[in-house]
């Protein structure tokens, strides 16, 4: 039985990220074939073929329905509301919200939501959240 892991690309050899980039170019039609996609991202065709069936982005090839994300938020009015608004904009559906009382002007919030109909990749959403004002920390806790 195969085992699957979710691993941050920061610790992987660069070739794995480039294979994902090539697959995205092919999926979106920005590259007409594997030769062109491989050339654009800077890998050999043999590297692409070697890893293409073993490297996937978080949502690619899976039937993930839910994500649980932890946030550490500055205690500023409207911060949680902006996060919830963004989840709604990308077709996420909130399932649970747990919020701790702010301590030292920061509150921990855990949100579980349905990601099956999201119109952006989860990675992109996490990046957006990390860059949002008054968001101190964002972490992916679980996916089902």
UniProtKB/Swiss-Prot annotation:
CDD domains per record: ACT_PheB-BS
InterPro entries per record: ACT-like_dom_sf (IPR045865), ACT_dom (IPR002912), UPF0735_ACT_dom-cont (IPR008310)
Disulphide connectivity of cysteines: none
Species whose genome carries this gene: Clostridium novyi (strain NT)
Family: Belongs to the UPF0735 family.
Domain ACT: 68-143
Official protein name in the record: UPF0735 ACT domain-containing protein NT01CX_1681
């Amino acid at each position: 039985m195969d085992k699957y892991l979710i691993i941050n690309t920061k610790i992987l050899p660069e070739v794995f990220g480039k294979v994902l980039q090539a697959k995205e170019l092919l999926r979106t039609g920005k590259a007409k074939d594997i030769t062109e996609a491989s050339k654009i991202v800077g890998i050999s065709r043999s590297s692409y073929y070697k890893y293409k069936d073993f490297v996937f982005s978080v949502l690619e090839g899976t039937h993930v329905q839910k994500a649980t994300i932890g946030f550490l938020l500055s205690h500023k009015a409207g911060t949680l509301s902006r996060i919830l608004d963004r989840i709604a904009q990308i077709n996420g559906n909130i399932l649970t919200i747990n919020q701790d009382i702010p301590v030292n002007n920061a509150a921990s919030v855990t949100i579980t939501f349905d990601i099956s109909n999201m119109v952006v990749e989860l990675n992109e959403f996490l990046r957006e959240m990390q860059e949002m004002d008054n968001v101190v920390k964002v972490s992916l806790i679980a996916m089902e």
